[in-house]
């Protein structure tokens, strides 16, 4: 298999969240940013506070940010509490959805737009790419783009997963 690429239709996605709800891609209103991660991944630990900033930057309802955990419910809950994550965390402990999307590593983000088309794939942690994702989401929701990671932020420009 190969990682789902830009321009391809996103595989179906239906996963239970830590909140007990089932999240289905085909029921989402607006674009979905799906971020695959593992709780043991140091790059994921670096990235998730910035994903939280992105989540807080734009009104909910016009878009969705879903973290897709490749770990157990208890480990995922501990990660959420440690990092102050408030966006939905979906559980893919059996890796069925991860295998369908086939990210090369974690974190990997898939921005899924209208018609379930993958419009952006961002592997690893990339400062510039997070700000570009922010601008794209702002366009979807009709808001001014928010800078998620300012130039003077001490995070490295890139960190592989």
Which positions does each model-derived feature cover?
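Structural microenvironment flanking redox-active thiols in thiol-disulfide oxidoreductases
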Residues: 45-83
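Cofactor-binding loop segments of dinucleotide-utilizing enzymes, especially the Rossmann-like FAD-
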Residues: 38, 70, 114
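Short, glycine-anchored, charge-dense loop/turn motifs used at functional sites
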Residues: 20, 110-119, 123
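Non-globular targeting/processing and membrane-anchoring segments
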Residues: 1-32, 64, 81-82, 102-105, ...
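Short active-site neighborhood of thiol/selenol oxidoreductases, capturing the structured segment around
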Residues: 24-45, 51
């Amino acid at each position: 298999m190969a990682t789902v690429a830009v321009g391809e239709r996103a595989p179906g996605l239906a996963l239970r969240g830590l909140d007990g709800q089932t999240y289905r891609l085909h029921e989402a209103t607006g674009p979905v940013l799906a971020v695959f991660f593992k709780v043991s991944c140091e790059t994921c630990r670096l990235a998730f506070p910035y994903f939280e900033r992105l989540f807080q930057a734009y009104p909910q309802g016009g878009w969705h940010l879903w973290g897709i955990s490749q770990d157990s419910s208890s480990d995922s809950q501990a990660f959420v509490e440690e990092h102050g994550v408030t966006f939905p965390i979906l559980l893919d402990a059996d890796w069925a959805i991860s295998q369908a999307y086939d990210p090369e590593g974690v974190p990997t983000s898939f921005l899924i737009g209208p018609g379930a088309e993958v419009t952006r794939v961002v592997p690893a942690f990339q400062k510039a790419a997070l700000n570009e994702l922010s601008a794209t989401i702002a366009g979807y929701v009709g808001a001014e783009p928010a800078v998620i990671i300012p130039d003077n932020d001490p995070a490295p420009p890139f960190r592989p997963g």
